[in-house]
Amino acid sequence: MTYVQVENIDKWYESGDTREHAVDDLSFSVKEGDIFTILGPSGCGKTTTLRSIAGLETINSGRIRINDEVVSDPSRLISLSPDKREIGLMYQSYALWPHMTVKKNITYALDGRDYAGDNDERVVEVLELVGLPEIGDRYPNELSGGQQQRVAFARALSYEPDVLLMDEPLSNLDLKQRRQMRTKLLDILDDVKMTTIYVTHDQEEAFEISDEILVMNNGKKAQQGPPEELYQNPTSSFVADFIGEANTFDATMANGTAERCLLRGASEPLELSTNWTEGNAISEPVVTIRSEDISLFDGPNDDRDGVENVITGTVAQKRFRGDATLYLIDVNGVEFKVQTDDPHYRPGQQVTMEVPSKSVAVVQR
């Protein structure tokens, strides 16, 4: 069942005689109980989109529905205030009142929403839910960053909203804390079964927590789908490059078909067999290859049976990444990124790359 529906929304700001679009004709839907992530670089419009759903921004056109109720529609002069939208909000800054105890921070939110149950009992419930049952009498400055984050989460859940909106909630934590809190958040959201819209610029975070991801760029939808689909089948060079470690090359079609492509910029012809099948015409083809889909072997070897794309190159750089090593391989002036768990290759060494054609995608620039 669709629980949140965003239909062709626009949000712009006047700048002299021009309009600067923060969100441009954006549409998507969120299923009930899903964790739906809006992913994109800084300035792409993801936070403005979240604030528009929350009622903190007034859209210029389009329509937003929550649980089949229209909450924003400028054409009908509908714009419900945030407290009328049955949403929970969690910000990048935890926005805890410093002069209030943890308990009072949560009861303040309950009072503001006219919570029908017993406030004291609800505070106990949500603090137990986030694993902090003993801190109700402490003040925010007596808590670690991770604890403050969990208190903010408890507060957002306290009045049992229909939809939870989370704007970069883990960005103020260090890497270890972020990974720990992702696990905790997933456990809690699995318990409460709450429809969640989550904003982040962190691809790893988005892939780990999401049922569905919307990638945004320049205020527009770039692509939407399950994490695996976005990773394996990007529809544009932007999505391929933004998600994961991808090689992206401008190309031309060989023999008029994208089944084989010539990479531009190489000093000698460099042609690859691709996974292209008949589909929409591509006017500006870009070849994309995931760095982990390329295999490396010692020395030049152009005669490897059963592999369509066998390429000889030279290791230009080596970058250690803990559980993997990233190599930059120069092939006639074109640079390939190859990620592998084999650390023995050295800069200056000649190597052979095997690139399965099923891993060579062709997308529109």
Model-assigned labels for residue ranges:
Residues 39-41:
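The feature captures the beta-strand-to-loop junction immediately N-terminal to the Walker
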Residues 86-92, 96-241:
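ABC ATPase nucleotide-binding domains
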